[in-house]
Structures are given as C-alpha cells and as structure tokens.
Design a protein with these regions (language model features):
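Generic beta-sheet signal
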Residues: 70-78
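A generic local structural motif
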Residues: 25, 58-60, 93
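Acidic, low-complexity terminal tails and accessory targeting/binding regions
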Residues: 9-20, 62-70, 85-133
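Glycine-rich phosphate-binding loops at beta-strand->alpha-helix junctions
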Residues: 80-84
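A generic alpha-helix propensity feature with a strong bias for hydrophobic helices
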Residues: 42-44, 58, 104
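Phosphate-handling substructures
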Residues: 1-54
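Generic structural signal for well-ordered alpha-helical scaffold segments
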Residues: 50, 54-65
Length: 133
C-alpha cells in the first residue's frame, strides 16, 4: 500500500539533480548553509516535511495497533525514517543521527505507544542479497 504522506521530501527545483550539478547554484548553497532547514525552491521545508511524515506515520501505527496487528513493516526513504524516528523513537536522537544504512532500517517496539506515543529501538537492520527474510 502506498501512503502519500510518507513520500520523501519534495525538493522542488532541486529534484532529480545531484550535488555536483548544483555546486554553484546559489539557492542550493543557501539551503545547505542553512543546514537544509530552509525551503527548497518550489519545495518543502524540513519542518513541513517532518510534520507530514509524523501525521502519516502515527496514523499507521494507531491503525495497526487498533487492528490487533503484531507487526507493521514500512518501507520508506531514509529522510522519512529520520523524521518519524526523531519525533517518536527512544533513545531520543537528532534527525541526522537517525540516518540508517543503505537498504536498512530499524526494528521498533510499540509497547509504550498508546500511553506515551514513543517507540523503543530494538535494533538497526541492513538487508543484502544474502539476508534471510
């Protein structure tokens, strides 16, 4: 199921371009200098992105728990993971500290979700061709 609210940040005019292509772009340089907190031209701010992610993420967790699910798997971009974990995961970490491995993610425990709206980090995972699913 595709959840629109969990899509990666809208990078506006930066979309589809890499840092080498933009290394002399004044808008890009200003955005990086602001720690990527300012809005991308025609795109989202990190704050708006994080708020969108957290609304969709919490709704998914609420629904899964209400439906009696014991396992919820969300496959998402790294920025999406970082935004949700910065808000909801324990131990508390900064957005950028939640940057996981490529093809990786996190296993979380929702035991305290209903009362405290937090998820406990169980482990970090990284999938490879050899990973046994």
């Amino acid at each position: 199921v595709v959840v629109d609210g969990l899509k990666e940040m809208c990078f506006g005019s930066f979309e589809g371009r890499n840092y080498i292509e933009m290394e002399h772009d004044p808008d890009y340089l200003a955005w990086v200098a602001a720690n990527c907190e300012s809005p991308c031209p025609d795109g989202e701010t990190k704050a708006a992105f994080s708020e969108r992610i957290c609304r969709a993420f919490s709704a998914l967790v609420d629904k899964a728990l209400a439906d009696g699910e014991e396992l919820l798997v969300i496959l998402a971009h790294g920025g999406t993971q970082m935004a949700a974990l910065e808000r909801y995961a324990l131990p508390h970490k900064d957005y950028y500290e939640w940057c996981g491995p490529n093809a990786g993610g996190f296993v979380l425990d929702a035991a305290d979700w209903a009362d405290k709206r937090v998820l406990h980090l169980v482990k970090t995972v990284q999938y490879t061709r050899e990973t046994d699913v």
